[in-house]
């Protein structure tokens, strides 16, 4: 790592730590039971901002500070980059399929932003990366202090490249997005939050995005209640690959229910 990359990484770490330090931090070693029940190794950070409170809970704080490839969770900021650069106009713009057959059937058709986010359509974001180029991608990453802000040579760089981010840094990013505090147009931030909706109840909305690098699985987002949001960032090891992926939501949902941040199933 060169001196400039080191300084950027240090700045990103300090930014995330500062954001977390601004709220009371409580370690929840007891949440190990949720990971044991799922036979999983990982960390979770919960930011509870309901009813005027602002407290952060963390299971395995050492791992929460460790950086991993963001995988498809990077589609959240990447979509903002594409909107800001004018590559993407809105959620309705049709992104024409390139005709290349891929193993996931829903990828083999025209896409729009909502569809591509929901189905993690990799080729759409590879096209965004091609059109943005490494220089602009790096500038955007530095602008929002996203992880180590390093694109690297692997493709896609958010899975195979050098870009990494910690659970703590993901939490900082999500809080800023929720509050429209990122350096992008407010309407673009609102649009991204809209396409992140996974499900909703009578008085709550769950906005989230999964990610998987092949070795580590993520689930990040928040639950909105009338009294305020509850943010969550989970990552786990996935030695059983596809077989481990459902554990991301299983563990997170069970922990959220334990603090009444999601209703019973």
Where are these regions (language model features)?
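Short, well-structured active-site flanking segments
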Residues: 83-99, 184-189
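Bacterial N-terminal signal peptides
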Residues: 9-16
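Active-site SXXK
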Residues: 67-91, 116, 232
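Structured C-terminal helix/loop/strand segments within mature extracytoplasmic catalytic/sensor domains
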Residues: 23-33, 38, 130-133, 178-265
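Flexible glycine/proline-enriched surface loops and loop-helix/loop-strand junctions
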Residues: 59-65, 108-110, 118-125, 152-158, ...
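Mid-domain, small-residue-enriched loop/turn segments at the edges of structured enzyme/sensor domains
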Residues: 105, 109-113, 125-179
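Beta-lactamase-like hydrolase cores
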Residues: 20-69
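N-terminal export leaders
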Residues: 3-7
